């Protein structure tokens, strides 16, 4: 039993300390001396130590004191943390405003103009006014739980002020390190022999991701709020400026530099003023964010891909420095793109040591006339990617010659080619090129593709160089023995060290075999000769004797975890699989659109390129790239190999009925991009024959007599004279007929069982991912939303559902468990 006086005193101290925090960090009006604050904090800490039941999660004493974590858990954002499109010039800002005025019909709409802090974006979740969880932005959909570390920031309220806040509130903002505090920290770090921080942004990000909150508490971090995520229905807003005002009232610091401005002229004036005072601010900013103030206007403008159309980041010119070009090298990407890179004399740019900079492509080098030995101006584009922007030709050394793209790939020796009209040169080696294979595998296992955790860049390079992995399908044949060999060899800095470590796992004749392998690759075991440069790769390529691995002498958990992660990736969704294939021009959005429209890998891999234009937002260039990829026997073999090794698509479904209008003969003629065949002319031609092959037989005179114009008729007949085009037309018609046969009937299309229904998913599902479940439900007409409200049709609840389930009960929303969901999906599939 807690005596009454200590409980009252603890409550009083918490109230006074929270009020002091609010006045100090939000209002910038300290009410009590620091000494008094420290005295009250110590008194409260002593009371909570004497009476542990007095401690509350929102107590100021809880800002430090959590145990060290072993890793950060994932947090799925209820409302995605979107990225912003960038503007680097005034005309881009003017175009941004023009689009909004044209859409909304307003001549001078209001915008919230806010400095873009150079820190780490986070999301703070409050329930009933109490801070319960904080997460990093991550990839915008999933972040890391850094709640314990965020509790150490005095600028983040543990309990909200006032009593007007909603039941559930997600606050979005930026954790940053003030410049004076950053400099003071580095001064102390140098005196104490600690590692100094590279720049305030890296300092903020690294500090917030410390596993030990005590370390975070020692770092001078601060926070500004700039928006909201999920908010329950008991609070509503009409303007973004109202949101910021409410955040201030609830205890959050909001930048005092935020202004409400009207029209493009005021936007640019604000930008100029901030650019002028940028270097005098106590924190780093890399631009200005403009947000449409009217929330109904925001909803009308909507989004494109992962960015809102009602907001934009107007970036400042990046910081620049001069340095010297020591060499120009070629890097080969996963699609074969040959990107020239300048190797530079190291130079500090925006707090980072820059040793190389992109030259983008051969045309850019020609425009700049960059040569080896030149003095150049380097900047960090967007303050992230270093690039060469100008050559100081007055400093050019005598004899410097113009650079030209090499004709052979520096990695595999294949010809480097450029398609007519393209800016990018590409290695023609495709998957025969180790550089492309490495990048293809790196992309394949990435988080938003097949999501194989634990397979890093260095490991991928060694697996490819050692010929253990030739393509992505080989990952599914990796064994524990292969991975342990990799670790044993790479940990050995010298051949002698390898032999010493190997004695724990192999003896006798097999040990002698290993010695012979080393001799074969050119190693002098006497230790007198030079060690071959690539001895580790050559040793890994050799036929090894069997090892009896001593698990006490070599770490195996990482290898077991990696094999388990690879195995888990065998079950995936169609959009992830398509994205993982790394097709040129196919990002996540396009992969999702393909999966939604066609629904089945077996269909997609057989389609000719024009049918990909049936998918919304896929144009001719992207469609041709997808078709080209699927037409390559090596790529088809790679897909076969993946399927053979157990990769399964878990969300296969029939093609969407919306394709029907795109599969008419007139639409097919449009998709073929035949010169002179306009949409109107395509409709006219479609009336002359039921199929493409029959239309191909029509003579020029027949077309002219039917009223087709001379240019269009001539163009069509010439196009059909090509055997390749005839073959394409026949294939296109056949695939079109197959697709039409698989489409849901028109009646079924209009009576999708979930048309108009809003569905929320929460908790973990055992049989399929929430992502896959959402896709299946969307195919049946449902709209997937992030929060429960009175308008929610039903909630799908898996394990550990959280507060959404409680709210669904309170609002009498229908609740489905996983069994009911699977039964419903199975019933539809059966139909």
Curated annotation (Swiss-Prot):
This is DNA ligase. It catalyses: NAD(+) + (deoxyribonucleotide)n-3'-hydroxyl + 5'-phospho-(deoxyribonucleotide)m = (deoxyribonucleotide)n+m + AMP + beta-nicotinamide D-nucleotide. It holds the Pfam family HHH_2. GO terms for biological process: DNA repair; DNA replication. It comes from the Bacteria. One of its GO terms (cellular component) is cytosol. GO terms for molecular function: DNA ligase (NAD+) activity; metal ion binding. The gene is ligA. Its EC number is 6.5.1.2. Gene3D superfamilies: 5' to 3' exonuclease, C-terminal subdomain, 6.20.10.30, BRCT domain, DNA ligase/mRNA capping enzyme, Helix hairpin bin, Nucleic acid-binding proteins. Keywords: DNA damage, DNA repair, DNA replication, Ligase, Magnesium, Manganese, Metal-binding, NAD, Zinc. Zn(2+) binds at residues 409, 412, 427, 433. Residues 749-831 form the BRCT domain. It comes from Xylella fastidiosa (strain 9a5c). SUPFAM superfamilies: BRCT domain, DNA ligase/mRNA capping enzyme, catalytic domain, Nucleic acid-binding proteins, RuvA domain 2-like. DNA ligase that catalyzes the formation of phosphodiester linkages between 5'-phosphoryl and 3'-hydroxyl groups in double-stranded DNA using NAD as a coenzyme and as the energy source for the reaction. It is essential for DNA replication and repair of damaged DNA. Its cofactor is Mg(2+); Mn(2+). The active site is at 116 (n6-amp-lysine intermediate). NAD(+) binds at residues 34-38, 83-84, 114, 137, 174, 291, 315. Belongs to the NAD-dependent DNA ligase family. LigA subfamily.
């Amino acid at each position: 039993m807690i005596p009454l006086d200590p409980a009252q005193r603890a409550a009083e101290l918490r109230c006074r300390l929270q009020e002091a925090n609010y006045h100090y960090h939000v209002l910038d009006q300290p009410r009590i001396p620091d000494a008094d604050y420290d005295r009250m904090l110590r008194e409260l800490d002593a009371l909570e130590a004497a009476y542990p039941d007095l401690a509350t999660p929102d107590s100021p004493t809880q800002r430090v004191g959590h145990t060290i974590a072993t890793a950060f858990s994932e947090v799925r954002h209820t409302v995605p943390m979107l990225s912003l499109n960038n503007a680097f010039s005034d005309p881009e800002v003017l175009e941004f405003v023009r689009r909004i005025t044209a859409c909304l019909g307003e001549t001078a709409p209001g915008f919230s103009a806010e400095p873009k802090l150079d820190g780490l974006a986070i999301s703070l979740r409050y329930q009933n006014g109490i801070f319960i969880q904080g997460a990093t932005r991550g990839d915008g959909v999933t972040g890391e739980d850094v709640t314990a570390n965020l509790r150490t920031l005095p600028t983040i309220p543990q309990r909200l002020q006032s009593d007007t806040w909603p039941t559930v509130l997600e606050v979005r903002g930026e954790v940053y390190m003030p410049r004076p505090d950053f400099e003071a920290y580095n001064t102390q770090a140098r005196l104490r022999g600690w590692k100094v921080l590279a720049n305030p942004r890296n300092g903020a990000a690294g500090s917030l991701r410390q596993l030990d909150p005590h370390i975070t508490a020692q770092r001078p971090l601060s926070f500004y709020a700039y928006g909201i995520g999920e908010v329950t229905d008991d609070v509503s807003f009409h303007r973004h400026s109202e949101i910021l005002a409410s955040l201030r009232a609830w205890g959050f610091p909001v930048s005092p530099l935020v202004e409400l401005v009207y029209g493009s002229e005021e936007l640019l004036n604000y930008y100029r003023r901030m650019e002028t005072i940028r270097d005098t601010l106590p924190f780093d900013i890399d631009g200005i964010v403009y947000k449409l103030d009217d929330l109904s206007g925001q909803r009308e403008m909507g989004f494109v891909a992962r960015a809102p159309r009602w907001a934009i980041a107007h970036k400042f010119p990046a910081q620049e420095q001069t340095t010297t070009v020591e060499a120009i090298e070629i890097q080969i990407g996963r699609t074969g793109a040959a990107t020239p890179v300048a190797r530079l004399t190291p130079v500090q740019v925006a707090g980072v040591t820059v040793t190389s900079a992109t030259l983008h492509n051969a045309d850019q080098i020609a425009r700049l006339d960059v040569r080896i030995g030149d003095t150049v101006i380097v900047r960090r584009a967007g303050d992230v990617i270093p690039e060469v922007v100008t050559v100081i030709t007055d400093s050019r050394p005598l004899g410097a010659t113009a650079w030209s793209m090499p004709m052979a790939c520096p990695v595999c020796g294949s010809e480097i080619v450029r398609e007519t009209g393209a800016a990018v040169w590409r290695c023609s080696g495709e998957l025969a090129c180790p550089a492309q294979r490495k990048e293809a595998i790196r992309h394949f296992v990435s988080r938003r593709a097949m999501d194989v955790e634990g397979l890093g860049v260095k490991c991928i390079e060694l697996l490819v160089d050692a010929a253990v992995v030739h393509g992505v399908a080989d990952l599914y044949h990796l064994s524990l023995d292969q991975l342990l060999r990799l670790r044993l060899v790479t940990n050995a800095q010298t051949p002698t060290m390898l032999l010493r470590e190997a004695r724990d796992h192999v003896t006798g004749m097999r040990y002698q075999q290993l010695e012979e392998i080393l001799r074969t690759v050119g190693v002098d075991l006497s230790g007198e000769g030079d060690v071959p440069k690539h001895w580790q790769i050559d040793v890994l390529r050799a036929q090894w004797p069997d090892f009896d691995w001593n698990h006490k002498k070599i770490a195996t958990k990482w290898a077991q975890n990696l094999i388990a992660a690879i195995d888990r990736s065998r079950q995936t969704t169609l959009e992830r699989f398509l994205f993982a294939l790394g097709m040129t021009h196919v990002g996540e959005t396009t992969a999702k659109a393909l999966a939604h429209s066609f629904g089945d890998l077996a269909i997609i891999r057989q389609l000719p390129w024009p049918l990909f234009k049936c998918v919304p937002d896929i144009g001719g260039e992207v469609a041709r790239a997808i078709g080209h990829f699927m037409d390559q026997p090596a790529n088809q073999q790679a897909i076969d190999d993946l399927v053979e090794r157990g990769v399964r698509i878990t969300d296969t479904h029939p093609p969407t009925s919306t394709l029907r209008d795109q599969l008419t003969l007139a639409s097919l003629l449009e998709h073929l991009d035949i010169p002179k065949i306009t949409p109107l002319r395509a409709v006219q031609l479609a009336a002359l024959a039921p199929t493409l092959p029959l239309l191909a037989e029509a003579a020029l005179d027949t077309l002219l007599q039917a009223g087709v114009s001379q240019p269009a008729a001539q163009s069509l007949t010439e196009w059909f004279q090509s055997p390749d085009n005839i073959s394409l037309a026949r294939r296109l018609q056949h695939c079109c007929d197959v697709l039409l046969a698989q489409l849901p009937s028109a009646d079924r299309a209009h009576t999708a069982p979930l048309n108009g229904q809003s569905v929320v998913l929460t908790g973990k599902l055992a049989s399929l991912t929430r992502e896959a479940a959402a896709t299946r439900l969307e195919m049946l007409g449902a709209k997937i939303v992030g929060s429960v409200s009175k308008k929610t049709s039903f909630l799908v609840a898996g394990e550990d559902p959280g507060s959404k389930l409680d709210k669904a009960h309170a609002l009498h929303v229908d609740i489905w468990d996983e069994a009911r969901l699977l039964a419903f999906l199975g019933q539809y599939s059966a139909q």
